[in-house]
Amino acid sequence: MRLLLALFFVLALVSPSFTQVWSNCGTAADKFQITNVVLDPPTPVKGQDITISASGILDETVTGGNVAVKVKYGFITLINENVSICSSQDPLACPIAAGDYQKNMTEMIPSDAPSGKYTGNVVITDQNNAEIACIDVDINL
């Protein structure tokens, strides 16, 4: 669940209203294109729920692969995980067919999360180790 929360949190930051804190570290050949992201409330608040709704288009079927997530608070690494996209932690079952995707998720932002600068990187690869998507994040909480 922690990995899923990190993935959706990073994905949420690709919304156009958050363009100052995220960058696409992928290439034009990436297989997943994000079409819309909505946060409610629009700014995460410690101790409150946040609902993230995200949609996008996957260009081709994915039968396996990995998600590498790294989240840091300052220079301290909080999350450094590499898991199968077909694992039980993933919200989709493999194979993942090409097409449109819409996911909604509500999570609580921990009230004891330290204030400060957080950075993150998510790289998703397919069964051939080809990049599906890559996002870098830089945010202050």
Curated annotation (Swiss-Prot):
Membrane spanning residue stretches: none
InterPro entries, per database record: GM2-AP_sf, Ig_E-set, ML_dom, NPC2-like
Record-level GO BP terms: sterol transport
Induction comment from the UniProt entry of this chain: Down-regulated by phagocytic stimuli.
Keyword terms of this UniProt record: Glycoprotein, Lipid transport, Signal, Transport
Keyword Signal: yes
GO molecular function, one term: sterol binding
Pfam families to which the protein is assigned, alphabetical: E1_DerP2_DerF2
Keyword Signal among UniProt keywords: yes
Sites where a glycan is attached: N82, N104
SUPFAM superfamilies: E set domains
Signal peptide start-end: 1-19
Family per record: Belongs to the NPC2 family.
Purpose of the protein: Catalyzes the intermembrane transfer of phosphatidylglycerol and phosphatidylinositol.
Assembly, per entry: Monomer.
PANTHER family linked to this entry: COUNTIN-3-RELATED, NIEMANN PICK TYPE C2 PROTEIN NPC2-RELATED
Name of the protein this chain belongs to: Putative phosphatidylglycerol/phosphatidylinositol transfer protein DDB_G0278295
Organism annotation: Dictyostelium discoideum (Social amoeba)
